[in-house]
Amino acid sequence: MMKSRMYDSTKLSFIRLLKLFEDSIDDVVAITRAFSIAYVIHRGKFYDNIKSEPYINHTLRVALILANELKVKDRDVIIAAILHDAFEKTYTNTFKEELLKKTIGEKALNLILSTTKFNIKEMESNEYCKLVLKSSQIVRYLILANRLDSIRILKNSIRKDKIQRFKKETQEYFLPIANLTDDNLVFKLSVAMYELK
């Protein structure tokens, strides 16, 4: 399934992730299956058009933030992190919901769908925060881990407009959500924001 050259950073991130679940062969198999799907979906895509940064690395980092930094050991949550962008409209090689449900299970699929129903660009900050705060804590973890990785990777970006937009959105939307979700996430987001200066 993975014929094209895989970047060393991708391999290392995937190995780090699997090591966190090495006590359960079922978890390793399920996470590997999700990674294979994500690899197909994101093949040829690069994060922020940086040719040295395959998009799949972003999804792996989100999974690692959850599993390693936040100590989330639920494989369905990790699968949802790996596949959180599976339904991006810009992708031509997206998987259908029914096929994903059969492959990764209903819980993981529902987590993915729960994280994608909030469109930050179409809502006011109060409305967005209220809707996200009504979701489960684990959905908020997924949303915040995604934002945390996006902020961390931006410190290497030359796009000042994107940096300013993400800083503003994080301040208005994500820090208030993190404040009502997990102090550790507030700290991590605040540090990442500070490092953008």
Protein language model features and the residues they cover:
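Active-site helical microenvironments for divalent-metal-assisted chemistry
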Residues: 2-197
